[in-house]
Regions:
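Signature of N6-adenine DNA methyltransferases within the class I
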Residues: 2-227
Length: 229
């Protein structure tokens, strides 16, 4: 058995494996929840509905050197689901999210049914206080990857937070994100300019006070419910 040295960077396209397959392929992976509880004293841990990508960054934490970076291609499910909210709260105890990149023009991988995102983050000390002034960039690619001739130029624009014909960039501080979260805006909304929203918070009304929402139901025989005119 050989002790591997810690690395400064990890770049990975993690597999997209649904919750149902996780138990078969790696039944011990959910032991990570025990580790998270021990290290963070968190009351909530990763949901049973989580894809496998939600577990792996926490394993990477001990492999990465101090202030090391991860670049992970993930399903976009973490941006707007219940288990994604828990994942976000937990991963930010281990890493400072620097930027999130999505496609605004089609999927990146034709052989994948899921929509992908790129998350770039820096390792932090779990016990360190949160820096509310630190900013996170939310980047939207305007062109398909295969149509972008100079990927290095695009990468530089993203790193420098410089908008161009190829990428739109919105940047929010942790303090601003907390404000938006309190309003009820999920992370999937931060790729748009929402700087105006906190100013009208007092004028907003919870739609549940006006409408009653129910979950849609799937039926096997749609013709029964949609008769011909």
């Amino acid at each position: 058995e050989k002790q591997l040295p810690k690395v400064d960077y990890i770049i990975s396209n993690l597999p997209f494996i649904r919750e149902k397959e996780i138990k078969k392929l790696n039944p011990n992976i959910k032991e990570i929840n025990k580790l998270i509880k021990e290290q963070t004293k968190a009351k909530k841990t990763l949901s049973k509905k989580s894809d496998i990508f939600a577990y792996i960054p926490f394993y990477l934490y001990d492999i990465i050197s101090d202030n090391g970076k991860i670049g992970l291609i993930l399903s976009n499910a973490w941006l707007g689901t219940d288990y994604g909210e828990i994942f976000l709260k937990l991963i930010q105890k281990y890493f400072n999210i620097d930027r999130v990149v999505v496609s605004g023009n089609g999927r990146w991988f034709n052989n994948a049914k899921v929509v992908t995102t790129l998350l770039i983050a820096t390792k932090r000390e779990i016990s360190d206080p949160v820096n509310l002034d630190r900013r996170i960039s939310f980047c939207t690619l305007k062109e398909k990857l295969e149509n972008i001739a100079d990927i290095k130029k695009l990468s530089s624009e993203i790193i420098l937070n410089k908008e161009s014909e190829q990428v739109n960039i919105q940047s929010y501080s942790i303090s601003e994100i907390k404000q938006l979260e309190n309003i009820g805006i999920p992370w999937s909304g931060y790729f748009a300019n929402l700087n105006w929203l906190p100013a009208i918070t007092e004028k907003l009304l919870d739609s549940k006070k006006i409408f009653k929402f129910i979950r849609g139901e799937r039926r096997g025989c749609n013709r029964m419910f949609y008769p011909a005119a």
